[in-house]
Curated annotation (Swiss-Prot):
It catalyses: di-trans,octa-cis-undecaprenyl diphospho-N-acetyl-alpha-D-muramoyl-L-alanyl-D-glutamyl-meso-2,6-diaminopimeloyl-D-alanyl-D-alanine + UDP-N-acetyl-alpha-D-glucosamine = di-trans,octa-cis-undecaprenyl diphospho-[N-acetyl-alpha-D-glucosaminyl-(1->4)]-N-acetyl-alpha-D-muramoyl-L-alanyl-D-glutamyl-meso-2,6-diaminopimeloyl-D-alanyl-D-alanine + UDP + H(+). It is a peripheral membrane protein. The lineage of its organism: Bacteria, Pseudomonadati, Pseudomonadota, Betaproteobacteria, Burkholderiales. Its EC number is 2.4.1.227. Pfam families: Glyco_tran_28_C, Glyco_transf_28. This is UDP-N-acetylglucosamine--N-acetylmuramyl-(pentapeptide) pyrophosphoryl-undecaprenol N-acetylglucosamine transferase. UDP-N-acetyl-alpha-D-glucosamine binds at T14, G15, G16, N126, R166, S194, I248, Q293. GO terms for biological process: carbohydrate metabolic process; cell division; cell wall organization; lipid glycosylation; peptidoglycan biosynthetic process; regulation of cell shape. Cell wall formation. Catalyzes the transfer of a GlcNAc subunit on undecaprenyl-pyrophosphoryl-MurNAc-pentapeptide (lipid intermediate I) to form undecaprenyl-pyrophosphoryl-MurNAc-(pentapeptide)GlcNAc (lipid intermediate II). GO terms for cellular component: plasma membrane.
C-alpha cells in the first residue's frame, strides 16, 4: 500500500501492550501510513513513541481493576474527561483505522472511534482478555488474539495469530545453531518485565551466592528503571558479579545469547521467548489481573518449552539447586520446544486488516 492513510495506535501501561503496538506501528509506517499513538502523558508509551518517531496524542486516564473504592468513585468523572480528550484527538487526527492493543488507555479512544464509525481492529496479547478488550470485542471490525481462547464467549470468532513482534525477534539464528558453538559457564538472563520485579531482584542474587563461584553462570540482570540501585545493593551484599541494567534495549539479542532465562510471564515476554527459541523459568506476577501471567506461561510450559514456578514457591535454595543441575543439552531441548510454538504472522495480519478496512 502506498497511499497516505492514517492509523491511531492505542496501547499503554506496560511493555506487554506497548511493544506489540510498536511492532504494528513500525510495519504500518513502512507501508506508507501516517501513524499516531494514543497514550497517557509522561508514561512508558509516551517515552517509547517519542523514541521511535511517533506523534503522541495524550489522554489522561488510568486503570481501575484492583484499585480502591476512592478510585472507583472517581471513575465517572475520569471517564468523561478521557472521552472528551479522545474525541478531540479523533477530530484532529482523522484516523482511517483505530488499532487497540489493550490496556486501559485504549478504551476511551476506541469507544469514541466507534461512535464516529471508525473501523476498529483489536488485538489481545494475554491468554485472558483484559476488561477493555472484552467490552469492545463485540463492536470491533476485526478481533485477533495471541493465545487460543483468550476472549472466550466475548469474541468467539477471534483469530489466533500470536503477538505482534518486531523483526529482530524473528531474525535470530535458531536454537541449534546458537547452542552448537557454546562452551564455558551458562549464560543467565534475568528479566522482570518492563517495570522490573522486586522478588526476582532480591532472590536471584541470594541464589547465586549459594553456588560455588566456579559453578555460577554469567549473569545479565534487568532491574526495571526504578530498581537499579537496589539491585546493585543486593548483588554487592551477595558478593556476586553480574552485568546489571535498568532496561535492555535489544531484548532479542539478549534472549538469543542466553542459555536460560528467569523472568515474569507477560504476554510479550512469552511470545518473544518462543520466537527466539529459548529455555525459561517463568515466575508469574502474583498480582496480575485474572492471573493472566500464569495462563500465558502455561501455554509454553505445557508444550515442554520451559518451567513454571509460582512466586510463593520461589526460594534462594531451590533456585540455586535448579541452576546447579542445568546442562546445555537439556536447555537446548527446552529451547527447541519453545521455538516450535512460535507464531510470527500477527504483525502482518493486523497490518492486512488495517489496509482492508481503510480501502
Amino acid at each position: 500500500m502506498t497511499g497516505s492513510k492514517t492509523a491511531l495506535i492505542m496501547a499503554g501501561g506496560t511493555g506487554g501492550h506497548i511493544f506489540p503496538g510498536l511492532a504494528v506501528a513500525e510495519a504500518l509506517r513502512a507501508r506508507g501510513w501516517r501513524v499516531h499513538w494514543l497514550g497517557a502523558p509522561a508514561s512508558m508509551e509516551a517515552r517509547i513513541a517519542a523514541q521511535h518517531g511517533f506523534a503522541l496524542e495524550s489522554v489522561t486516564f488510568s486503570g481501575v481493576r484492583g484499585k480502591g473504592l476512592a478510585t472507583l468513585a472517581l471513575l465517572p468523572l475520569r471517564l468523561l474527561r478521557a472521552f472528551w480528550q479522545a474525541r478531540a484527538v479523533l477530530r484532529r487526527v482523522q484516523p482511517d483505522v483505530l488499532v487497540g492493543l489493550g490496556g486501559y488507555i485504549s478504551f476511551p479512544g476506541a469507544l469514541m472511534g466507534l461512535l464516529r464509525r471508525k473501523p476498529l481492529v483489536l488485538h489481545e496479547q494475554n491468554a485472558v482478555a483484559g476488561l477493555a478488550n472484552r467490552l469492545l470485542a463485540g463492536r470491533a471490525d476485526r478481533v485477533f488474539a495471541a493465545f487460543p481462547g483468550a476472549f472466550g464467549s466475548a469474541a468467539p470468532k477471534a483469530r489466533w495469530v500470536g503477538n505482534p513482534l518486531r523483526a529482530a525477534f524473528t531474525q535470530q539464528a535458531g536454537p541449534a545453531e546458537r547452542f552448537a558453538a557454546r562452551t564455558g559457564p551458562l549464560q543467565l538472563l534475568v528479566m522482570g518485565g518492563s517495570l522490573g520485579a522486586r522478588a526476582l531482584n532480591e532472590l536471584v542474587p541470594q541464589a547465586l551466592a549459594l553456588l560455588p563461584a566456579a559453578q555460577r553462570p554469567q549473569v545479565l540482570h534487568q532491574s526495571g528503571a526504578t530498581q537499579i540501585e537496589a539491585l546493585r545493593a543486593h548483588y554487592a551484599a551477595a558478593g556476586v558479579q553480574a552485568e546489571l541494567r535498568p532496561f535492555i534495549d535489544d531484548v532479542a539479542c539478549a534472549l538469543a545469547a542466553a542459555d536460560v532465562i528467569v523472568c515474569r510471564a507477560g504476554a510479550s515476554t512469552v511470545s518473544e521467548i518462543a520466537a527466539v527459541g529459548a529455555a525459561a523459568l517463568f515466575v508469574p506476577l502474583p498480582s496480575a489481573v485474572d492471573d493472566h501471567q500464569t495462563r500465558n506461561a502455561r501455554w509454553l510450559v505445557d508444550a515442554g518449552g520451559g518451567w513454571l514456578l509460582p512466586q510463593h514457591e520461589l526460594s534462594p535454595r531451590g533456585l540455586a539447586q535448579m541452576l546447579s543441575n542445568l546442562e546445555r543439552p537439556a536447555l537446548l531441548d527446552k529451547a527447541l520446544k519453545a521455538h516450535a510454538m512460535q507464531k510470527t504472522s500477527a504483525t502482518q495480519e493486523l497490518v492486512g486488516a488495517c489496509e482492508e478496512l481503510a480501502a
